Amino acid sequence: MLADKVKLSAKEILEKEFKTGVRGYKQEDVDKFLDMIIKDYETFHQEIEELQQENLQLKKQLEEASKKQPVQSNTTNFDILKRLSNLEKHVFGSKLYD
């Protein structure tokens, strides 16, 4: 997937040879610059791999979560009030109704 979009690999950059002219660039400067580019490419590649793995993991988690039964939300206000009333009777007993 990513290989289709990226034109150069770190290895290709490393192995690239430049022709020198009469007053060409300093080879040492070119090598240093290419080394920086290679390090960046390797860092980007590693980051992309990690993000793709995380993306797959999150998609699986989402799929699993959507397959699970939804939490029962059948508890209505009436049920809550009924439970509350029973708890009050149990805690306060007959004091509540005196």
Curated annotation (Swiss-Prot):
Pfam families: DivIVA. It comes from the Bacteria. Its main location: cytoplasm. Signal peptide: none annotated. Keywords: Cell cycle, Cell division, Cell shape, Coiled coil, Cytoplasm. GO terms for cellular component: cytoplasm. Induction: By high-salt conditions. It is found in: Cytoplasm. Residues 34-71 form a coiled coil. One of its GO terms (biological process) is regulation of cell shape. Divisome component that associates with the complex late in its assembly, after the Z-ring is formed, and is dependent on DivIC and PBP2B for its recruitment to the divisome. Together with EzrA, is a key component of the system that regulates PBP1 localization during cell cycle progression. Its main role could be the removal of PBP1 from the cell pole after pole maturation is completed. Also contributes to the recruitment of PBP1 to the division complex. Not essential for septum formation. Belongs to the GpsB family. HAMAP family: GpsB (MF_02011). NCBIfam families: DivI1A_domain (TIGR03544), PRK14127.1 (NF010725). Forms polymers through the coiled coil domains. Interacts with PBP1, MreC and EzrA. This is Cell cycle protein GpsB. It comes from Bacillus subtilis (strain 168).
